[in-house]
């Protein structure tokens, strides 16, 4: 059984017949994300619901997206316990002021862990005066990308319960895919993978999310 999934007996009703069959379900478990500066104690940022797996990427991507982590200041990312439900991100310098988040952030939406919408808006950067023109992608190729993403979703194929975020190059080639119950978590994993690889910025790339 793959990480983030669990086998379970379920009742299936087909063609007027009710029967018990074995199925594979997507599961969520809490992950406590902590951050520690060069000379300080570890501080809890959030407790994030997620399917176990790719936790290093999730924590790194979330902190980067929150503006709490600059890639060149990342020192180490690792689990703090054998159970794998707490992860610590260590920085080379001091931790910036932490956002006021609720204790638990579910997979429902990326804003749910924030204390207020005003806090979200205050953290947004000022819009650029000139919007940089991105890559040009043929419409025919662009319309093919959802099917490419869907065919690569092994977790969804097994459970029917996982979303995905995919990173494509300007030619429409799938470079990276991550799955999660929440699409924002899946995107944080993609971003986190690129941060850990030192592969930022992501200019001339396409991000694609699965739909309902």
Where are these regions (language model features)?
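Glycine- and Gly-Pro-enriched alpha-helical subdomains that act as flexible
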Residues: 155-211
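Intrinsically disordered, low-complexity regions enriched in acidic/Ser/Thr/Pro/Gln residues
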Residues: 1-177
């Amino acid at each position: 059984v793959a990480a983030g999934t669990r086998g379970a007996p379920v009742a299936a009703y087909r063609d007027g017949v009710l029967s018990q069959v074995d199925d594979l379900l997507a599961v969520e478990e809490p992950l406590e994300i902590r951050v520690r500066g060069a000379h300080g104690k570890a501080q809890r940022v959030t407790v994030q619901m997620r399917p176990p797996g790719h936790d290093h990427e999730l924590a790194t991507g979330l902190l980067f997206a929150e503006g709490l982590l600059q890639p060149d200041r990342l020192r180490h990312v690792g689990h703090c316990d054998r159970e794998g439900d707490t992860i610590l991100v260590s920085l080379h310098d001091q931790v910036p002021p932490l956002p006021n988040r609720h204790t638990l952030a579910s997979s429902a939406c990326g804003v749910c862990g924030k204390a207020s919408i005003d806090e979200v808006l205050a953290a947004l950067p000022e819009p650029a005066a000139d919007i940089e023109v991105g890559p040009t992608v043929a419409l025919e190729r662009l319309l093919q990308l959802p099917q490419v993403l869907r065919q690569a979703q092994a977790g969804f194929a097994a459970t029917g319960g996982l979303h995905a975020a995919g990173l494509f190059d300007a030619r429409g080639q799938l470079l990276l895919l991550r799955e999660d119950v929440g699409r924002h978590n899946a995107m944080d994993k993609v971003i986190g993978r690129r941060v850990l690889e030192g592969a930022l910025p992501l200019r001339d790339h396409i991000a694609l999310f699965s739909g309902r």
